[in-house]
Amino acid sequence: MPNNKVKENPMSLSPGAKFRLAVKTHHPLQIVGTINPYCAMMAKSIGHQAIYLSGGGIANASYGLPDLGITTLNDVLVDVERITNACDLPLLVDIDTGFGGAFNIARTIKAMEKAGAAAVHMEDQVAQKRCGHRPNKAIVSQQEMVDRVKAAVDARINPEFVIMARTDALAVEGMDSAIERAIACVEAGADMIFPEAMTELKQYEQFSTALRSATGKPVPILANITEFGQTPLYSGEQLAAVNVDMVLYPLSAFRAMNKAAENVYRHLLEHGNQEALLDQMQTRKELYAYLHYHEYEDKLDQLFSQPS
């Protein structure tokens, strides 16, 4: 029999639905960190299907602060809105611990939806959190994390908006606790799971198997492949083989940008001229291409050209 089902048009989908579709159709889905709107535009033009805004990245790049839970909801919203206004790729946003108790979490979720985010991840660290790949992390009780998830799920307007639960329990309480927390979060309504700072490839498969067994359904799992952290830099192929659905590169481009800027600043101070660095720079033409600069110029000419 012919298949008469209408194929979904990604352009007509909500941000959350776009994210879910991307997870469903890519094995695994690459999610790349975009620290600002221009980076998001580049990622889309190059061909990526989903983007990410790191809480640590916001603290570092937008406020000159360490990733220690210092930034606020409003700090994050500024960058979310800038990115979603410039790029329609589904955006996953790091909301740390939710920015407070149940009503604060509800406010966070509603604000993220309104700002155009597709998904958020929220973790089980204490409010005075640390980077997920640093020592001495502390986590809240499993029940408190479950309550956070319930508050988030209850607050969302569009059921397609994605609530992803992150657990940092592996480094604090071990694998059994991390899996138990993940199961409890899914039972509380979390759509996807982010097991942070895994140290062995097989651990992802353990999560996947345990979640499917406990919930009776496949639960999408994210692997955070951040540089210089606790997790080895596994390839997408390796991760797909252990049932990872999403591979996150949260700050890869940001770190490369920072190193390039550092080299330019040092070179200018030492040599007083940048000519030797031109082959390492994006050209004006390349810059303009991502911005569609000439289309703006043409519009100006059309609007304000003088009659001959």
Curated annotation (Swiss-Prot):
InterPro entries per UniProt: ICL/PEPM, Isocitrate_lyase_ph_CS, PrpB, Pyrv/PenolPyrv_kinase-like_dom, Pyrv_kinase-like_dom_sf
EC number from the UniProt entry: 4.1.3.30
Pfam families: PEP_mutase
Binding site for substrate: S54, G55, G56, C131, G132, R166, E196, N224, I225, T226, R255, R284
Assigned keywords, A-Z: Lyase, Magnesium, Metal-binding
Binding site for Mg(2+): D94, D96
DNA damage is among the record's keywords: no
Family: Belongs to the isocitrate lyase/PEP mutase superfamily. Methylisocitrate lyase family.
Protein name as annotated: 2-methylisocitrate lyase
Native species: Vibrio cholerae serotype O1 (strain ATCC 39315 / El Tor Inaba N16961)
